């Protein structure tokens, strides 16, 4: 089984490392415009792998042909979000990068599924889908899984125990919200305080250390695992919607079933209030796409 990563910076390389540690990988390919970085990270990963008696083929470089045969390609390349910058501020800067990456992936690894991480992630997921021409089950985005990890951490610290399900859905950004009707845990919490904490905690991490790294890496690993091991796990995922929840022609976070065919929207009922919030997220994202000519 082969994994591809476009972007060998901190999120891309840490995600590759997390997958290397936890999955049965035959090959990993790292592609980055900074060729030396990609080669160096590949070498470092290979040395780490040998320490746990794993010897997959690990390659790095700037040539997209390295991605050929990847079961799934994780795209983290793009300009990073800076302190004080919203995810949507990044849209104009990263849209051109994603458009170019989409073309190169299709030319070199047309059968691969694509997991988009580059922010603003929902907008970039839609652009990747549109520019690649791939079926919508093969292009999806990571955002709400990370938000949901943050939610679980906040819930636990607020007194929740045995957290069986806790999901954030909607935009990976300011209009995201807790799917309270689907939450399942023991104990009582102050939902308003918890939701407010989750909404702003990423900015706090960025303010203190410059970027979020470990949280995204684990979220990416969880989604990659579900695909390559065909687990069918339901994970909050940015999906291209074509009528689901009364939403069309936009990528937004909803519960999705992940497996060998990629991602498909899960048949899960939301409350009327949650559907309204989801449609609000979708409206905001559609407006951003229109500003970019999509």
From Swiss-Prot:
Residues of the signal peptide: none
Family assignment from sequence similarity: Belongs to the LDH/MDH superfamily.
EC number(s) given by UniProt: 1.1.1.37
Pfam families with a match to the protein in the record: Ldh_1_C, Ldh_1_N
Top-level taxonomy: Archaea, Methanobacteriati, Methanobacteriota, Archaeoglobi, Archaeoglobales
GO cellular component, one term: cytoplasm
Organism: Archaeoglobus fulgidus (strain ATCC 49558 / DSM 4304 / JCM 9628 / NBRC 100126 / VC-16)
Gene name of the record: mdh
Binding-site list for substrate: 81, 87, 119, 150
Superkingdom of the organism of origin: Archaea
The protein, known as: Malate dehydrogenase
Keyword match Chaperone: no
Function per UniProt: Catalyzes the reversible oxidation of malate to oxaloacetate. Can also oxidize tartrate.
Active site: 172
Disulfides per UniProt: none
